[in-house]
């Protein structure tokens, strides 16, 4: 019995390591919980540094249907999701490519709020063929995969962080992006009527 060899499967070992890492991260998040007002202040500070940064926080797409009618789709960009995730804190976000069948590439993102133990998984598919059916080159597939992963990241982060909390600061950022805010510093402070020492 002393010389008995115990076989440990690699997959099981990796799962155990991942579980241990998550447990440590959750314990740390519980020990150092986020300050929501401080997080929102950070979002405002990062997003409203200047008009160009504020503009990067949003995307606008113009689409035309079969009847020739055009419509405008707008929303928060990947950059804004990165700012929100970094300022919010105590988040665990992972992205990966989970599928490539030669026609479509599928990216997955998982966002886990370590404080609330609420997690969301989002998948994004992107075509990797031309209109004529020719498959993209390897380099273009990598580029498309990275873009899909970024979009999945954005969707997962925005699904986890409550929109009701970030809505007001997002509106302030939009005003700066549109050039309608009188003063970036004033707009940032007015989000919560804070004093200069609190900003």
Residue ranges and their predicted role:
Residues 1-105, 110-199:
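Polyanion-binding surfaces on beta-sheet-dominated domains and ring/shell assemblies
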